[in-house]
Amino acid sequence: MINIHATKKLYAKLPAPISAPQSETTPLTPTLSLGEREQNPLSGWNANLLILQRRNCVLLVHDATRFPLFVKGLLKADFANFNHLFADALMNTLLKLGASQSQLDTAAALLAPCRFDTACDRSVQGTMNQMAGDLEHRLWFDNARLDDLSSYATGAWLSDRPCTVKGQKDCIWPNSAMLALLSRAGNSAPAKRNVIQLADYLSSRNG
């Protein structure tokens, strides 16, 4: 599972089957044991609903690395398809960062259904609020239209900053931290993997 801690504002937008714990697999779910899924290093995100230029957007921040994902222009039906939205945002943002083939393969193999709750972390939310503020300022300062903004490039841009993490002395850079996490996970993973076609994650959106 990919555990996502949603704000109440976002949680209220999710259909009941999505906001409830999910156990079913999807075509994106790798062949992992239950124990491996519970220890999934990609799991653990905080997420919030942003209203930008009257459009529903979601900003997610990975708890351990502070790596952000940005999803823009969601319609009501899109919230019921969050597994695909998450996978699409993750893979394409990693591509924008210049992730290696090995790192992309590891990320694809770790994808699993999203499970939502409202147990948000204040420290992660602090980072998320800073990123949201910077994004809003960028739209205002550049007089930019949300529709002209690449979700994936925006996520990569937001990740290129030092962030503080509670309990850690040194700052971390989310982009480097996420790539390092994927490298470690790939090195420790079993040799047998599903064959992943990265083209499945390439969106028709501007990115």
Language-model features: locations:
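Low-complexity, highly charged intrinsically disordered N-terminal segments
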Residues: 1-8
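Short, basic/aromatic recognition patches
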Residues: 18-25, 40-50
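Intrinsic disorder/low-complexity segments
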Residues: 26-39
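A short, conserved beta-strand element enriched in hydrophobic/aromatic residues
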Residues: 44-81
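A short, polar/charged loop-to-alpha-helix boundary motif
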Residues: 76-93
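Cysteine/selenocysteine-centered motifs that mediate thiol-based redox chemistry or coordinate metal-sulfur cofactors
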Residues: 94-133
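Long, charge-rich alpha-helical interaction segments
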Residues: 145-159, 171
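Short hydrophobic short-linear motifs embedded
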Residues: 168, 172-205
